[in-house]
Amino acid sequence: RMTHDDKHLIMDDGTATLTYLDPTTLKPVKKVQVYDDKDAMVYINELEYSEGYIYANVWTTNLIVKIDPETGKVLAKIDLDGILSMTNSGKQVDVLNGIAIDPATKKMYVTGKYYPKLFEIKLVKKE
């Protein structure tokens, strides 16, 4: 549950807090609270840094949030409800819990505990 930018390791602890660590000493440098327009965004989990933003799964939900790393503000919510219905696997699955972004192609991949597949998704702006 860690990612990095060019300067720091960035870690979540399952709450709304992102902790920035010095990569050499592993000592905390700063903490940022993640929030949306209503309240603190708790259960932040599974971080991925890409193109100046942090993407995080919200534990036990089908949401991925796009976070401003400086302020902690949630800039977008990506709702993946229904993604499993595309598999028709009939197997028991647990929760969304995997995000990866290929830096070369900018493609996002998501999966979860006991998911039968890895999904490649394309992000589009909601109109």
Segments from the language model and where they lie:
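Short loop/turn segments that connect beta-strands within beta-propeller blades
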Residues: 22-26, 68-72, 122-126
